[in-house]
UniProtKB/Swiss-Prot annotation:
This is Nitrate/nitrite binding protein NrtA. It is found in: Cell inner membrane. The gene is nrtA. Keywords: Cell inner membrane, Cell membrane, Ion transport, Lipoprotein, Membrane, Nitrate assimilation, Palmitate, Signal, Transport. Residues 31-52 are annotated as: Disordered. It is a lipid-anchor. Pfam families: NMT1_2. A lipid is attached at C26 (N-palmitoyl cysteine).
Length: 443
């Protein structure tokens, strides 16, 4: 298929949560689960009188994915309260489409102020290309929540092929399906989001045109495994713990973890509505400091068991610790006979500058969204990044919590190299685009 149509996008982005999505669009918040209230005693206040937030709380959304842990932990360990935001709500969203809709509503209309989100989405919202109103919704990215920790998995129908990251057997499967009158069905979590871009990159690098040789469908992350079981798709790209759960249930196997595609790649972000942040600058700083501290906590191996026990609860991920813990500590059972221990491709929350929102990474996301027609070729990427990416606030918050030594010197991480040998130079994104075989650029 050439592209997700807007109609198909609106109908499928919520997957089987469509009913909840339409209720939400009408102003109901039934598609979200409020997990307000932590189980821990708040730490001593981290604010002084002059730093006191303008409000007592913020309403944040999250999807049941391991990389939502910093937002959840900031609530559970009393870090929001520590920085003067004791009334903060952390609300489960059923899909990225619901997250989008609730951000558009804002908390004053029953929605949310900010969220754990796919890194490209704040840009697509700010550009107005995915809002239901088709109007721009200015957003800020305050931090990256994690790097790595996603996977591309296949159905057991293709277990004999044992497809890996760079593998001619993948194209053979796609060619066989096309010859039989079908297309390789690949599930992603949101059009133009990270999982969509990882899947498209993987297919294209293996000689498969995502627009003509595959059928990309949208399924919410927590519903991926159930849909694989019913044969909805042949392959999917999603964050943990859902690849691990697929393997644990013996319904499929992981071809590659996304760190194999691009080592230490950026993934989710902490986003906030720009109007909320501009109205509440001290509360925004408090929010950022709390999440940064939570990321540091999540990175500490001593906290791994507690992190898994907290997030496995029904109100958060509704899965087992066994689905979360192994891959989070770098122990990867691919489900096809391969396994690794203590892999450096595990999810990072703070180490290796995981939390810093590099503008060069956002440029790659925008370049890929231009590549596949989610943004027009005329997009002023530099201006859009300067509008959305608030690395200045990240630096200020990191300094305030005593982590000045972790502040990068530059907003660019420099040239990035992908598994197929292709490089992305943020100083020359056009050269990167020009060198790609498969693309669907729109004027």
């Amino acid at each position: 298929m050439s592209q997700f149509s807007r109609r198909k996008f609106l109908l499928t982005a919520g997957g089987t949560a469509a009913a909840a999505l339409w209720l939400n669009a009408c102003g109901s918040n039934n598609s979200s689960t409020d997990t307000t209230g932590s189980t821990s005693t708040p730490a001593p206040s981290g604010t002084s009188g002059g730093d006191a937030p303008e409000v007592k709380g913020v309403t944040l959304g999250f999807i049941a994915l391991t990389d939502a842990a910093p937002v959840i932990i900031a609530l559970e360990k009393g870090l929001f309260a520590k920085y003067g935001l004791p009334d903060t709500k952390v609300v489960k969203q059923t899909s990225w489409a619901v997250t989008r809709d609730n951000l558009e509503l804002g908390s004053d209309r029953g929605g949310i102020d900010g969220a754990h989100i796919l890194s490209p989405m704040p840009y697509l919202l700010t550009a107005g290309t995915i809002t239901k109103s088709q109007k721009p919704l200015p957003m800020y990215i305050l931090a990256r929540l994690n790097t790595q920790g996603q996977g591309i998995s296949l159905s057991n129908e293709f277990l004999a092929e044992k497809v890996q990251i760079k593998d001619p057997k993948l194209k053979a499967i796609a060619d066989q399906k096309k010859a039989s009158g079908k297309l390789l069905k690949a599930a992603v979590t949101f059009p133009g989001g990270t999982h969509d871009l990882w899947m498209r990159y993987w297919l294209a690098a293996n000689g498969i045109d995502p627009n003509n040789d595959a059928d990309l469908v949208v399924i919410p992350p927590p519903q991926m495994v159930a849909n694989m079981q019913t044969g909805t798709m042949d392959t999917f790209c999603v964050g943990e713990p859902w690849n691990a759960r697929l393997v644990n249930k013996k319904l499929g196997y992981t071809a590659a973890v996304t760190g194999e595609l691009w080592k230490f790649h950026p993934e989710k972000a902490l986003t906030i509505r720009a109007d909320w942040a501009d109205k509440n600058p001290k509360a925004t700083m408090a929010l950022l400091k709390a999440v940064q501290e939570a990321q540091i906590w999540c990175e500490d191996p001593a906290n791994l068991d507690e992190l898994c026990q907290i997030t496995a609860q029904d109100k958060y991920f509704k899965t087992s610790v066994e689905d979360i813990k192994p891959r989070l500590q770098g122990d990867i059972d691919y489900g096809d006979g391969r396994s690794v221990k203590n892999s450096d491709l595990r999810m990072r929350f703070w180490s290796e500058n995981a939390s810093f929102p590099y503008k060069s990474h956002d440029l790659w996301f925008l370049t890929e969204d231009i590549r596949w027609g989610y943004l027009p070729a005329s997009t002023d990427t530099k201006a859009l990044i300067e509008k959305v990416n608030r690395s200045d606030l990240w630096r200020e918050a990191a300094k305030a919590i005593g982590r000045e030594q972790d502040i990068p010197a530059s907003d660019s991480r420099g040239v990035e190299t992908f598994f197929d040998g292709v490089t992305f130079d943020p100083e020359n994104p056009q050269a990167y685009l020009d060198g790609l075989k498969f693309k669907a650029i729109k004027a």
